[in-house]
A protein has these predicted regions:
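Bacterial N-terminal signal peptides
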Residues: 7-15
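Sec/Tat signal peptide C-region and signal peptidase I cleavage site
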Residues: 16-22
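Right-handed parallel beta-helix
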Residues: 23, 88, 134-146, 171-185, ...
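Acidic Gly/Asp/Thr-rich repetitive segments characteristic of extracellular carbohydrate-active
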Residues: 30-68, 77, 122
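Extracellular beta-strand-rich solenoid/capping regions of secreted or surface-exposed proteins
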Residues: 47, 54, 68-85, 93-138, ...
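Glycine-rich beta-solenoid repeat tracts in large extracellular/virion proteins
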Residues: 77-80, 124-130, 149-151, 161-168, ...
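Acidic, glycine- and Ser/Thr-rich low-complexity intrinsically disordered tracts
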Residues: 85, 94-120, 295-296, 304-341
Length: 341
């Protein structure tokens, strides 16, 4: 009898533990009025779902435009919790992730919270902090971030108008894929800012498009900032078009007393423009830092800069390069050359 009771108790406790650890699946639709447990009972409040989501939870967001606040709070952002998977691009009837057809439905995360002028938009649309590789953002259009604050440091009012990935004093390396980042503006890193101050930011950015983003200074699309830390992102199968900045209109990499060793593969850099150097990519080493991009299988076409180099400026590792462009320190390629690696 005691053995039966013991076995029953173990089964009960095991089932209880499984129920406690079970992951939640939330559904978000603009017209939703439910608790978010199914498409039929979807909620319209994405911010509320993000606030209660825990590691292992999954969020599906249907087509439509979502803003981080309905008020005039420019500091509001969509904060993605560590370990949470957030997917957009749904019609609102899919049963499996594979039922989603990318491009069929547009799920937009927008910083347009005020009037039609951008100066009252939210500073940063999406924010990660200490996010592990299990954290996923997939299938969104991210637009309208406007980080025009005074340049006094690497904060959300000046950097990362589209996405701010903060690994300061920790590690933040989420997966960002199948996203379009367009028409974002900031002082630095308009589309994505990876900040590694005394920490690490090594996200994977895959199958994304960066279109018409603009920064006043560094990184029109992406700024990988290895400031006293480690910033080694993987960027693959992405396209960069029409982005603008002072330095590094497509991607700017900086190793300020730290390490910045990005791997950029199978990407296209087309018609990006920098005022000074690096129409496509600029590597900036400061202090005793290390900064070197590994490039493989990329295409550079019609990128330009007023003073310096149109495509890639500074030291890089080139793999599978064409014979007429040998790998060497200080590789400089003019935008008149459409070069494929």
């Amino acid at each position: 009898m005691k053995q039966i009771l013991l076995t029953t108790m173990m089964v009960f406790l095991g089932g209880l533990a499984m129920s406690v650890q079970a992951n939640n699946h939330y559904f978000v639709q603009l017209e939703g009025e439910g608790d978010g447990t199914s498409w039929k009972d979807a909620t319209s409040n994405l911010q509320e779902v993000l606030a209660k989501a825990k590691a292992g939870d999954v969020i599906w967001v249907a087509n439509g435009t979502y803003t981080p606040t309905n008020e005039a709070d420019r500091t509001a952002s969509f904060i993605i919790p560590d370990g949470v998977q957030v997917y957009g691009g749904f019609i609102g009837e899919e049963k499996k992730l594979t039922d989603r057809v990318l491009g069929e439905a547009k799920t937009i995360l927008s910083g347009e919270i005020g009037t039609e002028v951008p100066e009252d938009n939210t500073y940063t649309v999406v924010y990660f902090q200490n996010a592990s590789a299990a954290t996923i953002l997939d299938g969104f259009i991210i637009t309208g971030g406007y980080a025009d604050g005074l340049v006094e440091g690497a904060d959300l009012t000046t950097c990362g108008a589209g996405i701010y990935n903060n690994g300061e004093y920790g590690v933040s390396s989420p997966l960002i894929q199948n996203c379009i980042l367009m028409n974002n503006f900031s002082r630095e890193g308009a589309a994505i800012y990876n900040y590694a101050n005394d920490g690490e930011t090594s996200p994977t950015i895959s199958d994304c498009q960066f279109v018409y983003n603009r920064s006043d200074f560094n990184g029109g699309a992406i700024f990988n900032d290895g400031n006293f830390g480690t910033c080694n992102p993987t960027i693959k199968n992405c396209s960069f078009k029409g982005n603008e900045s002072m330095y590094g209109a497509g991607v700017l990499n900086r190793g300020l007393y730290g390490e910045c060793l990005p791997v950029i593969t199978d990407c296209a850099f087309i018609d990006n423009f920098s005022v000074v150097r690096g129409g496509a990519i600029y590597n900036q080493r400061e202090g005793r830092g290390v900064c070197e991009a590994q490039l493989e299988g990329n295409i550079f076409e019609d990128n330009g800069s007023t003073i310096g180099d149109g495509d890639v400026d500074q030291t890089n590792k080139f793999l599978n390069e064409s014979p007429d462009q040998p790998s060497k320190a200080g590789v400089r390629m003019r935008s008149a050359e459409a070069i494929s690696y």
